[in-house]
Swiss-Prot record:
Component of the BLOC-one-related complex (BORC) which is composed of BLOC1S1, BLOC1S2, BORCS5, BORCS6, BORCS7, BORCS8, KXD1 and SNAPIN. It comes from Bos taurus. The lineage of its organism: Eukaryota, Metazoa, Chordata, Craniata, Vertebrata. It comes from the Eukaryota. The keyword Membrane applies. This is BLOC-1-related complex subunit 7. It is found in: Lysosome membrane. Keywords: Lysosome, Membrane. Belongs to the BORCS7 family.
Length: 105
């Protein structure tokens, strides 16, 4: 059995070398694409974590605002009671002043 001519062996070697180079380039491209995807996924994870932290901060701010609104409602109620008391005192002082004027006449 003849193994072939040196010329055909050289062409076969070049063909194999070309296929191997093509496969290596394809694998390199795939590795680069995979690396980009992993980095993108890592960045997405970071962004998701940051969004979660921001949401917690916003929730705390909302809870603090609700607490402040409750306190302001209580203060408003107390101020209304004080206003009513002052108004009654003004009316009574006006009546007392009228009575005093009537007595002094």
């Amino acid at each position: 059995m003849a193994t072939g001519t040196p010329d055909s062996q050289a062409r076969f070697g070049q063909s194999v070398k070309g296929l191997l180079t093509e496969k290596v380039n394809t694998c390199g491209t795939d590795v680069i694409a995979l690396t980009k995807q992993v980095l993108k996924g890592s960045r997405s994870s970071e962004l998701l974590g940051q969004a979660a932290r921001n949401m917690v901060l916003q929730e705390d701010a909302i809870l603090h605002s609700e607490d402040s609104l409750r306190k302001m409602a209580i203060i408003t109620t107390h101020l209304q009671y004080q206003q009513e008391a002052i108004q009654k005192n003004v009316e009574q002082s006006s009546n007392l002043q009228d009575q005093l004027n009537h007595l002094l006449k």
